């Protein structure tokens, strides 16, 4: 986890090695998989681990919970700009992210650097995480901003983490899909959906938590960490504030035998 700007604990591969990737290097992220594939647990584990290992001055999250089911445990955390349940409330927050990217772009030009991480005091990384982004496909204003983040967000410290159960041929625009180069997919129902996810091997997966990781064009089978809501809530509660306004901060189930717990990983990590 050390030395990485946005460390993503993906899972253990067949050699027994834990794959920890830096999203700042791997670019924007797409997670896919059918119900029961382990996708929700993986997202929960990724968000929780980043909150535990990074300060609010280092990373901020904008969360879209379009199924009303996944991100409630992240409310009132100093790392979280807000949790938004529908397109109407999400749009103005994404518009503010777009304005912040523009501000940061001007700052980079003024300072003659290519990335915010080259600045002496960089602003926090912004991670826009939207569960079931497919529900926004008919919202052109939102999708335009999401695509813009995918194109220019990296140098400005803004990243996408998008999830959906499965795709169809028109679910994501070509430009956006091409920019989601960091991919993890659980079980897909058929070869068509596996192909659209970009990971053809995902149709052959038959175990909960078994997924295909693709980075820099290379695929490998991994077993992703297990993190249920109760455990995540217990880890996060000490960080919560009594009250938190949901406005964006802008500067000026039982474990199965083949699953492993992120709690064990966190307990072994040095604090600080």
Predicted features, each with a name:
Residues 109-118:
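Short, glycine/acidic-rich hinge or "gate" loops at secondary-structure transitions
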Residues 245-266:
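N-terminal, intrinsically disordered, polar/charged segments of Gram-positive cell-envelope systems
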Residues 1-110, 126-198, 202-206, 212-241, ...:
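P-loop NTPase catalytic phosphate-binding loop
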